[in-house]
Amino acid sequence: MRFLILFLALSLGGIDAAPPVQSRIVGGFNCEKNSQPWQVAVYRFTKYQCGGILLNANWVLTAAHCHNDKYQVWLGKNNFLEDEPSAQHRLVSKAIPHPDFNMSLLNEHTPQPEDDYSNDLMLLRLKKPADITDVVKPIDLPTEEPKLGSTCLASGWGSITPVKYEYPDELQCVNLKLLPNEDCAKAHIEKVTDDMLCAGDMDGGKDTCAGDSGGPLICDGVLQGITSWGPSPCGKPNVPGIYTRVLNFNTWIRETMAEND
């Protein structure tokens, strides 16, 4: 099993370490420039770690397993190696993981049937509000359940190869199908709960991967998921990936933002 994160790992020049659980985009394509204006790049110090989602000028949503001790973020980025004047850099004043996420599962261990990665979400409060522009825009929280069979778009700067990780400079997108949770429950030893979504390509070859954690899953134009965890290697046939079901956490998200604004 893999998280879709690089714990303290991915920099512009390479990788220092790999996590027990990872997620990246395999089998995707270069996103159209500025087509994902809510996409956030979350760094630990100066090293890229995870994706994120801009909810409003003050708040970024990401995965709880992306928790670290020193955040900064980039908004409106497309290519890590290009100077993009429209991109915005922000520091983070507060990180609030969901209180029910089991952080102890981040320690390397052999996957167990009782492993439950539910509640894998975290809010980041920006120290300075984002400037909302054509290339930096928030996305709304969902208001209804996604439909099974929907085509969903995941995006991120995670690995584009399933085993020997290689990371793109350009933001990647991949189209995935929203599948019944039963498909993921059959494919994974870990628990698959109602707080998760199952998405992928049952033929294999398309998936999120190491470095995509915390990024968005957009189904029929609506934010529905946060990239969380999945198989290792990525993109295995009949082994879809797991995403945090955002709709189930709308109340916690809204209340947490209101209490900390």
Curated annotation (Swiss-Prot):
One of its GO terms (molecular function) is serine-type endopeptidase activity. Residues 19-24 form a propeptide. Disulfide bonds join C31-C173, C50-C66, C152-C219, C184-C198, C209-C234. InterPro entries: Peptidase_S1_PA, Peptidase_S1_PA_chymotrypsin, Peptidase_S1A, Trypsin_dom, TRYPSIN_HIS, TRYPSIN_SER. Glycans are attached at N102. The keyword Cell membrane does not apply. Residues 1-18 form the signal peptide. One of its GO terms (biological process) is proteolysis. It catalyses: Preferential cleavage of Arg-|-Xaa bonds in small molecule substrates. Highly selective action to release kallidin (lysyl-bradykinin) from kininogen involves hydrolysis of Met-|-Xaa or Leu-|-Xaa. SMART domains: Tryp_SPc (SM00020). It comes from the Eukaryota. Keywords: Disulfide bond, Glycoprotein, Hydrolase, Protease, Serine protease, Signal, Zymogen. Belongs to the peptidase S1 family. Kallikrein subfamily. Glandular kallikreins cleave Met-Lys and Arg-Ser bonds in kininogen to release Lys-bradykinin. This is Kallikrein-1. It comes from Mus musculus.
